[in-house]
């Protein structure tokens, strides 16, 4: 069925679904619902068995695979990825490739229940409480992260980037803190691990803490492998605490 702002098909054939995905992404966004398996390969490997899922493809290359629970996708590829849909063995396949680092996501549909493409706009978001504001609030209130922390540096330059906060704990041990305002992914974990490894090579006794509004399941797994810690914050509450959010001013 054709509409002014897009198109949709219920129970499409694999060929119909592939055509709609490949042409529809130019409009802005494609959504597909169906029974599928998902396979991720890259820095690690992961797979999801067959069940009904929501798959979202965006014009900028973003791919999101959602299930019935939680806000974050189960598996995803970021903007800049290349996506194509095709039919293989009588099944619809959606393949997303990220070049750097090389990561692929393959979604294989056993059945497609619904697929739609819509003309969706893109705007700039004005944040109240940016990531820099969150860092500033944590610097003023380091006990939010951990009791006894003393901040010794902010935006500290290193050979692998600028670390957000450098602190010492109550035992005098250095603590490197990586801050993400919203959802932390494996990239944030890898960056924190690089900072910690750099300081350890220089002979420092150091540990790392990732502070964020939330963390993906895969990122949390990597965090534990590296022996790092996670502290969850609520950026909105943090801004209210430090009087940085004018929307909450009385």
Swiss-Prot record:
GO molecular function: DNA binding; single-stranded DNA endodeoxyribonuclease activity
Enzyme Commission identifier(s): 3.1.-.-
Enzyme class: hydrolase
InterPro entries: Endonuclease_NucS (IPR002793), NucS_C (IPR048301), NucS_N (IPR048302), NucS_N_sf (IPR049173), Restrct_endonuc-II-like (IPR011335), tRNA_endonuc-like_dom_sf (IPR011856)
Pfam families per the UniProt record, alphabetical: NucS_C, NucS_N
Cellular localization per UniProt: Cytoplasm
Keyword DNA-binding: yes
Span of the signal peptide: none
Swiss-Prot/TrEMBL keywords: Cytoplasm, DNA-binding, Endonuclease, Hydrolase, Nuclease
Protein name from the UniProt record: Endonuclease NucS
Natural source organism: Pyrobaculum aerophilum (strain ATCC 51768 / DSM 7523 / JCM 9630 / CIP 104966 / NBRC 100827 / IM2)
